[in-house]
């Protein structure tokens, strides 16, 4: 098989480096960091200056308003708009870009990458056409600029609070002169999150000679630079108020005055300390650059949200003060980072972990729910699951407990009960109907894992009733497993599968993925998943296929990148999959694939991150995998072992101890034959958190050929909730949704020699129920329930499906007076079809058929069409709407197709008589078309 690599040559941009093997470690890890890595392709990182976890990220903005503008900078650009003080790193959504400074009236400013320099805490660019050298550094809350103008260049500086990276709504904002060398300002916006406040106080190394204000939110300053001295500007920022912005500025920079180099050196020292937490020896220069840049990227997010006096803005917009010694954090991409970044931090920085858990709990206290994706002082609601529960449970079960655990469990339980994204159906029915909610399969699978986390937390605290509730819910993944395809599939409310099914398609039932990329997501119960597949052999064959099938996908989704077969390293749902071989007795394949992914998915170039860096998750995968272990199931306290990338690594652990990791010639050997910790052999293919935190020496003995004995015995496999052989849930392969006359049903199980007992009256089957022996015919609407049994196996879950006979309801006896459909046209911003009813009617009329071609705007409009459908004969008809923003189709009073607020289409069937039933179609179009 040839690796299908999305890092094609056409993406490369002109930086070419030749790296050779070298056994010597660099003098300082900071010298191996390249902040330009990830600024090309879709990495969405920024090259500018920031302190570790800094509240200020001072970086150039080269574009806005499109997906590759998420960080404000893209390496393919050659002009910039200026330097703003807040940025996101590696995200898939755009926001921030606050407080833009531009050292020229020219816009945009032309630059060359050959004139850029970047290192942790420092960025510079020589803007030759504008005649100014721009240099940037930061402290945690202050951005520091140094502009060196050519003598013949007028020293002009534009301060722009109107600048936005995305189409945000500006509630208010202003810039004011508050001294001969001082400006203050603020703005409040609604973007990815509502009510984003930012305040600043800017002080300059010399008075400005003039100031003009083109608008209330802009200022143009001029300076006398005949002395030849550069202009240094210090900008203190806060999301609380102007007074705190000033206090941040004073406490973090007053002792340095306007000495740019001294401030830069202090921040560089902070970075040297942060990057010294893991040092590696051996490997190539390229691998060390990848490693230390990954470590750097893992320490710029989350961001400090509290000021130097401890004040911070809460999610209810109130201002509170944290206890001394603590920090409040925001910018958590929990859907991404629960997988590897947070488990990595439990090893490296337990103080940080405690602060983060306290921050999450404070967000719960202010809003009534643990956050999914908090930003600034609000919740974006982006992505799925409730993965704050994983973060908290993982910390608590590892003994990191600097918070009220009972309160944490309460927050976890309440957040899991919120009626969001189909959670009401998930709790009541055990699955989320795909005809009612989008992303139903992905949501269910991630809810199930999060519920397992809550169960473990409850058990540790002695709440066994809660444990039983949530551990039962954690097995709901079984309900959407289709044995006929061996995929998790979208299930309609009546128990029938969504059709047609294409595992290579970007479907409505999955989040940023195909069915392949969610096929193996049961991190808490991999053994249970193998039982659904029919056993180890079937599971291994399908896991092999993941990496071997075509990388073509049906549909367009920019997140699905870094494809090897259908494994997509550029997006997080795939990140654990190479490690699953260690659960089924083939750890040597884990070692093969992790090495290949390390080698081919990360490069020391701007395009070198194969997808969104995602707030440290892509980097954490690289760091942990290159050290030789990875957390597949946070909360289990286990890390799956794999082959290290480096000869030696030193980890400074969060408890003050040091772990030394050694391996013999990993450049030549990628297979494990033996692992010891402080001289004691580890036979399992995993190591525990407690073992790692002992410190000492973790030694890997490697070979050039696979050792198919090490770690292969079933008793050496990592944790799974299911411990005993279990019969897979039965299934019916054909669709029983609507049938005319009669239909045949055939029950099967992936478990060899399983005996299926079933009922046709809706009752629960047991071993006294009839034994299935051959297909049976249904002539009426019937609820089929089935359960699989086998000696020595735990019985399966009950399978339930409704076979529905089509009932042709008479249509209205009416004779339409016109051909076509009536329409009502609306304009505005809509999230749901119901929002149309609140909008102002722009136009009404009649057209031959439903169409949006006459819309007066390219986006932000909606239609409601009404009329009648002509059915040429009685029968069952199929309907679909192909809108990717939101649409709902009613026939009579029945909702037939529900694509509301969705970005994927769904089909439906409905019986019609030959007469004319009424139709109502409502749809809207947003920014994405």
Question: For each predicted feature, which ranges?
Answer:
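Accessory carbohydrate-recognition regions in carbohydrate-active enzymes
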Residues: 25-390, 396-445, 453-479, 485-488, ...
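Short, compositionally stereotyped local motifs that mark structural "simplifiers"
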Residues: 719-824, 829-834, 840-867, 890-892, ...
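Extracellular Ig-like/FN3 beta-sandwich strand-entry sites
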Residues: 230, 695, 742, 779-783, ...
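Aromatic-lined ligand-binding clefts that engage carbohydrates, nucleic acids, or primary amines
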Residues: 747-749, 869-871, 875-889, 919
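Beta-strand signatures of extracellular beta-sandwich domains
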Residues: 674-676, 755-759, 878-880, 888-890
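C-terminal motif of bacterial Sec signal peptides marking the signal peptidase cleavage site
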Residues: 20-21
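Short beta-strand-plus-loop segments that form exposed binding edges in beta-rich domains
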Residues: 921-928
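Short proline/glycine-enriched turn/loop motifs at strand-loop junctions of beta-rich domains
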Residues: 151-153, 667-670, 749-755, 882-886
